[in-house]
Amino acid sequence: MITAEKKKKNKFLPNFDKQSIYSLRFDEMQNWLVEQGQQKFRAKQIFEWLYQKRVDSIDEMTNLSKDLRQLLKDNFTVTTLTTVVKQESKDGTIKFLYELQDGYTIETVLMRHDYGNSVCVTTQVGCRIGCTFCASTLGGLKRNLEAGEIVSQVLTVQKALDATEERVSQIVIMGIGEPFENYDEMMDFLRIVNDDNSLNIGARHITVSTSGIIPRIYDFADEDIQINFAVSLHAAKDEVRSRLMPINRAYNVEKLIEAIQYYQEKTNRRVTFEYGLFGGVNDQLEHARELAHLIKGLNCHVNLIPVNHVPERNYVKTAKNDIFKFEKELKRLGINATIRREQGSDIDAACGQLRAKERQVETR
């Protein structure tokens, strides 16, 4: 729930007249109802309408009194996302460009796997981290999303899957934006979708990825939540990582590893390192050896990512043979590593690419 204190703390939050009803955790809905002189058990009914029956309006909540429905309408909106573009890949990946109520656009991706359906969600409109290989940073950061706007991405995809009686089984927070720069809303989102009164998606089926906002890594380590944790690393040496990710100048590799060690001491959980391979930049055997030396001794897994080409960026894909050699060298050195399966390569699958293309069309 967005309070005045939250707005003061998070200057990039939108200033809507009413906040999304999806931004309330179950306990917050209970407390709000009691404050309004309503019965606490109504929260369960409201959440059933929102997350099991997945209604699009408060008026459809027919087992609530008219007075309570009006009270809800006076204070909240049922956030709806308008589909601007839908691209479907031959491998079943679907990329959505959604329009928010203030006209900004965001991306959400549905990825189909043998083990279920995964949704990649966005946490910000744009991004200010400035990774030099990423289309998400084109145009900078416009604003943060409310927790309810992040929840709505999952719900909107779930509604599309309802027609074929499928369900969203995994969530990855790897879309546009840096989740740890919208930390409180991200945490509310996690607690909402994990709640068995809501979508009941297991914590171990949810992954949060960060570019390495070190203070928030310490905060995340102290949270009582079993969410999977991933770090975009992409290079073991500061010189190369700073070139790829300017955030490294503020939070360098040494400090990042220290924060990850703290996370593991607190949680005893494995960390995934995401390592995008860029031709001639970080994809040689010497880079694999540097990476292995850096993370040796950590409980970790390396996810090697053959990057999607972004026309606005100059990086090129690593040759397939070099990718296999890189993986083989890591394994030889005792590092658990896999190559991520490419999905959506025949559509605008790179993070932020579809939104960037749409912005170009709008400004012509």
Swiss-Prot record:
GO terms of molecular function: 4 iron, 4 sulfur cluster binding; metal ion binding; rRNA (adenine(2503)-C2-)-methyltransferase activity; rRNA binding; tRNA (adenine(37)-C2)-methyltransferase activity; tRNA binding
Positions of S-adenosyl-L-methionine binding: 177-178, 209, 232-234, 308
Upper lineage: Bacteria, Bacillati, Bacillota, Bacilli, Bacillales
Family: Belongs to the radical SAM superfamily. RlmN family.
Cofactor note as given: Binds 1 [4Fe-4S] cluster. The cluster is coordinated with 3 cysteines and an exchangeable S-adenosyl-L-methionine.
Pfam families in alphabetical order: Radical_SAM, RlmN_N
Subcellular location(s) per record: Cytoplasm
Ligand binding ([4Fe-4S] cluster): 127, 131, 134
InterPro entries listed in its UniProt record: Aldolase_TIM, Methyltransferase_A, RlmN_N, RNA_MTrfase_RlmN, rRNA_lsu_MTrfase_RlmN/Cfr, rSAM
Note: Reaction proceeds by a ping-pong mechanism involving intermediate methylation of a conserved cysteine residue.
Enzyme class, first EC level, given as a word: transferase
Occurrences of domain Radical SAM core (ranges): 113-346
Protein name: Probable dual-specificity RNA methyltransferase RlmN
Gene coding for it: rlmN
Predominant place of localization: cytoplasm
Reaction(s) catalysed (UniProt annotation): adenosine(2503) in 23S rRNA + 2 reduced [2Fe-2S]-[ferredoxin] + 2 S-adenosyl-L-methionine = 2-methyladenosine(2503) in 23S rRNA + 5'-deoxyadenosine + L-methionine + 2 oxidized [2Fe-2S]-[ferredoxin] + S-adenosyl-L-homocysteine; adenosine(37) in tRNA + 2 reduced [2Fe-2S]-[ferredoxin] + 2 S-adenosyl-L-methionine = 2-methyladenosine(37) in tRNA + 5'-deoxyadenosine + L-methionine + 2 oxidized [2Fe-2S]-[ferredoxin] + S-adenosyl-L-homocysteine
GO cellular component: cytoplasm
Keywords: 4Fe-4S, Antibiotic resistance, Cytoplasm, Disulfide bond, Iron, Iron-sulfur, Metal-binding, Methyltransferase, rRNA processing, S-adenosyl-L-methionine, Transferase, tRNA processing
Function: Specifically methylates position 2 of adenine 2503 in 23S rRNA and position 2 of adenine 37 in tRNAs. Confers resistance to some classes of antibiotics.
Example GO biological process: rRNA base methylation
SS bond list: 120-351
Cofactor: [4Fe-4S] cluster
